[in-house]
Amino acid sequence: MTRLFGTDGVRGLAGRDLTAGLTLELAIAAAEVLPERGIPGKRPRAVVGRDPRASGEFLEAAVVAGLASAGVDVIRLGVLPTPAVAFLTGELDADFGVMLSASHNPAPDNGIKFFARGGHKLSDEVEDEIERRLGRAVAGATGRDVGRVTDDTDSVERYITHLVNSLPNRLDGLKVVVDCANGAAAGIAPEALRRAGADVIAIGDKPDGFNINEGCGSTNLDALRAAVLEHGADAGIAHDGDADRCQAVAADGSVVDGDQIMAVLALELYEANALHNNTLVVTVMSNLGLKLAMKEAGITLVETQVGDRYVLEAMRAGSYSLGGEQSGHIILLDHATTGDGLLTGMHLLAAVNRRGVALAELAKVMNRLPQVLVNVSGVDKTRVATSERIAAEVAAAEAELGDSGRVLLRPSGTEPIVRVMVEATSQDRAQAIADRLADVVRDELSINA
């Protein structure tokens, strides 16, 4: 049986895959599992937030109904970024948090993820326990034992204050464009940047429930690049639908991705003696150029499988303060318990302002090797690891590249695709090898074969 939880909670087409009924059952099962890891004898409490997708309204109602019927007090936070829900799980002393979002996915999709006490993502083992209890857990609270439901009207203010107070220096004098992806960051990211002193131009800041991530945000930087150039801004910051990731655009229109952002922040923390154990945690998808730059700076690199949850697990295990993914999920563990796009963007801008150097120049701390990523759809991703032909082709490509590049082929944890990533000394060489491997994957794993 396929595992219900992916690398970032449960996702699917809202109303078909992620139904009100399934969401209700997940909430009831979570209410049975998560308070067991809370404080004995204390009435369970949960916070619930969502991004602005229209389907979030009925899914929120299902979550609240499930939790309250299981005897959990519920604090509705409204529309907030995922990291804000994680922060408020701890800030409001909740036993757990619930976020409804499908992150960078299109508007018809939605998802549900849980945070444990303190705002940390759940381990695979805890998610498996919730999944095992689906349909078995009983919402048996009656009378005075049913959960009460309240709204926290200060949630946005609490989060913005937290962001601004985390900065090592202000952003006065910087002109910044922020793309809110018509998502949860709308109205929050611009205000946080303004309070930190920046001159802000906001785009993608008019969510209507159906336009989230549509032609905007961290997975589509064209609008941000155009706005940065049009307004003569010092930098642009882009978030995804739930604002747990960040990508940047420099004044010259060049893209500064998650690897480059991590390189800048790692050196900032290193110089301030705040990079715990002089270590940066990344995933196997990070560019080889980042690894070489950190080695030259004397910073140790710890590598994990793809998924910010695995980055976080390694960070907590080793007491490290910085880690993340090339996609822009970056964790500043001294200030947050999970990837926070707003926090990341503001700390990047603080580094730009403190050094008085253009972002494009600052990003040159690492030399990014040409990288090609091909997403192969219409294939059975579950057979990747068992295909001898694919393994042989990958080995041949690795031998061809030697020390001047690398190959990574893996199934997506959140989508029905296989990702083929190749790095090489030239874009053409990387593209040719990636295309060749993608053709093998299609031929070998095609669902229609």
UniProtKB/Swiss-Prot annotation:
What EC numbers are recorded for this enzyme? Answer: 5.4.2.10
User: What does its PTM field state?
Assistant: Activated by phosphorylation.
Q: Name one GO molecular function term.
A: phosphomannomutase activity
Question: In which domain of life is the source organism classified?
Answer: Bacteria
Positions of post-translational Phosphoserine modification: 103
Question: Cofactor binding mode, per the note?
Answer: Binds 1 Mg(2+) ion per subunit.
Top EC category: isomerase
The GO annotation for biological process reads: carbohydrate metabolic process; peptidoglycan biosynthetic process; UDP-N-acetylglucosamine biosynthetic process
Obligatory cofactor(s)? Mg(2+)
HAMAP family to which the protein is assigned, alphabetical:
GlmM_B
Entry's family note: Belongs to the phosphohexose mutase family.
Query: What is this protein called in UniProt?
Result: Phosphoglucosamine mutase
- Look up and give the organism this protein is from: Thermobifida fusca (strain YX)
* Source taxonomy: Bacteria, Bacillati, Actinomycetota, Actinomycetes, Streptosporangiales
